[in-house]
Every structure is written in structure tokens, then in C-alpha cells.
A protein has these predicted regions:
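Cell-envelope/extracellular polymer assembly enzymes that use nucleotide-activated donors
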Residues: 2-4, 9, 22, 34, ...
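Short, well-formed alpha-helical segments that are part of the catalytic scaffolds
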Residues: 12-26, 49
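A conserved acidic beta->alpha catalytic loop
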Residues: 22, 39-48, 66
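Short, conserved active-site loop motifs that form the nucleotide-linked donor/cofactor pocket
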Residues: 33, 59-61, 112
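Glycine-rich, basic loop-to-helix element that forms the pyrophosphate-binding segment
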Residues: 65-81, 91
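Donor-binding/catalytic cores of nucleotide-activated saccharide
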Residues: 70, 91-200, 210-223
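Short aromatic/hydrophobic "clamp" motif used to bind/position activated sugar donors
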Residues: 86
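Catalytic core of nucleotide-sugar-dependent glycosyltransferases
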Residues: 205-212, 219-235
Length: 235
């Protein structure tokens, strides 16, 4: 198994179908990658949507669990994954058509622990908004160590879905997402990336982030979230 796409799913029935379809519209044989849809105690009809796609696609695996939050869902998905590489995909977003083969080839050609992916944003009117021009992407073949990568690309945001990881790199080092924490992506990145020996920028848009109300990123506004943000950055 080459790749595992891990889709934590909670209350996203309006978006899940599009996300799964984007994961199916790929240039790898279905036998070479799996789509793990993890229903995290979702009260809507997400599980029915996932089952409908599973009927005709043997590479879709459905996991159901009591609601434990995004970090717990990602951890469960990681432990269930069989792929050599893993990609955490938010189930209200989508990935670019026919991007998996190039991602896999990049990971294997350079023997990477992590590959940073370029992405774009989509607003509620379905307009695509380029994030920014990444001047560092001119360095297509440069391999970074973890701390060097973080120092070189301080302007880059760290989201779980903006990286593809070698699964054994995460498992062997015991890297899991901390549960019950806002800004878990940032905390995860600041803890994981320094341990990576080989990281590379992949300067093709592979991911579309769906800007919407109701997501964690759009609703954080509490003292706890402020404290967690400082903690995530090591402050």
C-alpha cells in the first residue's frame, strides 16, 4: 500500500461527497492507496454518504467511533493506516485531481520524511483564491532538515493537511496529535518537523481549503484557544 488518505469526519455531510470524489479522481490504481473515512461520532448523515461511495470503491475504509475531536480522530486513522505515506485530509476540503502519483514519486525519489504541499483557498462563492506566491518554490530540488526548513519558511503556515508524511517516521517517533487542544496543527508541526531529516517543498497546488463558517479555524475565540495558540508555538 503506497498511500493512506485519512479523513476525520464530523458534521460535514454537505462537503464529504466532494471530498471523497476528489480522493477517488486520482492517477494511482485503487489497489495502491486507501481512503480512511473516520466518522467521529458525527450526528448527521456523513456515514451514509461514506457507505454509498464504499459500495463501488474497495479502497474506502470506514471507521466509526464516539466523538473525541479532531486530534483523536486523526490519531485513530494513523494507527489504522497501511500506507507507506499518510496524508491527513479535512473532509470538508478537497485534493487536486491526479496529484497522488506525483506526490508518491516525490516522496520516494528523495526519500522524504515529509513533503510540504502548496494549496489554494475557496470561498463560499466557489471562487479560488491563491494563497500567495511562494518564492521558495524556486528551490525545487533542495532538501531541508527539520529546523532548517522551519527557519527557512517562517512565512508558511503549518496545517496537518499541508504535509504528506512517511508513516514510519511518525510511528517510530511516537508522534500523535495532542487531544483537547486548539491549534493542534501548529503544535504538531512544531513538535514533529524538527525531528525530520529530509523535508522538501512541492510547489504544485495539491489541496483546496474550503473557507466556511463552522470550522475550527473560523470559530476559535476563547481564552483557552489563546492559551493553546501560545502553547502550540512553545511560548
Amino acid at each position: 500500500m503506497l498511500l493512506s488518505l485519512i479523513l476525520p469526519t464530523y458534521n460535514v455531510e454537505a462537503y464529504l461527497g466532494k471530498c471523497i470524489e476528489s480522493c477517488l479522481n486520482q492517477d494511482l490504481p485503487k489497489s495502491e492507496y486507501e481512503i480512511i473515512v473516520e466518522i467521529d461520532g458525527s450526528p448527521d448523515h456523513s456515514i451514509n454518504i461514506a457507505k454509498r461511495y464504499q459500495e463501488n470503491n474497495d479502497n474506502i475504509k470506514i471507521i466509526t467511533r464516539e466523538n473525541g475531536g479532531l486530534s483523536a480522530a486523526r490519531n485513530t486513522g494513523l494507527k489504522a493506516a497501511n500506507g507507506e505515506y499518510v496524508w491527513f485530509v479535512d473532509s470538508d476540503d478537497s485534493i487536486t485531481e491526479n496529484c497522488l502519483k506525483a506526490i508518491y514519486e516525490e516522496m520516494t525519489q528523495y526519500n522524504l520524511d515529509a513533503l510540504w504541499l502548496k494549496w489554494c483557498n475557496m470561498n463560499k462563492f466557489h471562487n479560488i483564491i491563491p494563497l500567495y506566491d511562494c518564492t521558495l518554490c524556486k528551490e525545487d530540488d533542495e532538501i531541508h532538515e527539520g529546523l532548517d526548513f522551519m527557519c527557512s519558511v517562517m512565512g508558511i503556515y503549518y496545517f496537518a493537511w499541508s504535509f504528506v508524511f512517511k508513516r514510519n517516521f511518525l510511528i517510530d517517533n511516537g508522534f500523535l496529535f495532542k487531544e483537547g487542544l486548539f491549534y493542534e496543527d501548529t503544535e504538531f508541526a512544531y513538535r514533529v518537523l524538527p525531528a525530520a531529516k529530509r523535508i522538501k517543498l512541492f510547489c504544485k497546488v495539491c489541496y483546496t481549503y474550503n473557507i466556511r463558517q463552522g470550522s475550527i479555524a473560523q470559530t476559535i475565540s476563547s481564552k483557552k484557544s489563546f492559551s493553546d495558540k501560545k502553547r502550540a508555538r512553545g511560548c
